[in-house]
Regions:
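Aspartate-rich (DDxxD/NDxxD/DxxxD) Mg2+/diphosphate-binding motifs
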Residues: 20-67
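Acidic-enriched, low-complexity/disordered segments with a strong bias for Aspartate over Glutamate
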Residues: 25-28, 34-35, 109, 147, ...
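Intramembrane alpha-helical segments
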Residues: 47-143
Length: 173
């Protein structure tokens, strides 16, 4: 067990959440989706930080970019610690690539998964298997030492399903 890795994983996950929310607010603003929402509630319409003037669109975009770059930086550092190479071929590299795609592609151009009926699936994947399996891989590293045959990925995948469903249901409302 490594407390350093725990804090890095937690920090990366928090930055990923900030990046996802900020990019969602920014792209929903640029598409006018949040502006045309006349019945915004805690369950729809984003955080409304742009609409009520708490932040400018540029500030929200900078928040998203700094957060996603921080997430990527932490992920690459962890990957280097595990594999010996920044871009070493590990599950962390691939979950990081998928997570970045989901975070920015949720409402970001040109993908806009949330506008094409794939928003709930993207959220379930991002908060379920991507985060849970990534964290599990890093935090159980001393037990498998980067040997995929020893990594209990099925256990992590099963543990991610309830989380994926619960987080997905937040936006289902």
């Amino acid at each position: 067990w490594s407390w350093n890795m725990f804090w890095l994983v937690l920090g990366g996950a928090c930055l990923a959440q900030i990046a996802t929310n900020a990019s969602n607010d920014y792209f929903d603003h640029t598409s006018s989706a949040d502006e045309i929402n006349k019945v915004a509630s805690p369950f729809n319409g984003g955080s409304r930080v742009i609409q009520v003037g708490l932040m400018t669109p540029g500030q929200v975009l900078i928040t998203a970019l700094v957060s996603i770059l921080g997430t990527i930086g932490i992920g690459l550092y962890i990957n280097q610690q595990i594999s010996g190479y920044i871009f070493g071929n590990t599950p962390i590299l691939w979950t990081g690539i998928l997570g970045t795609f989901l975070a920015l592609g949720y409402t970001g151009d040109p993908v806009r998964l949330g506008y094409k009926g794939f928003g709930e699936i993207a959220i379930a994947l991002g908060f379920g298997p991507v985060m849970v399996m990534g964290a599990h891989y890093v935090l159980t590293f001393p037990m498998h030492n980067n040997d995929l045959a020893l990594w209990n990925w099925a256990e992590a995948l099963l543990a991610s399903i309830p989380i994926a469903l619960l987080v997905m249901l937040i936006v289902w409302i």
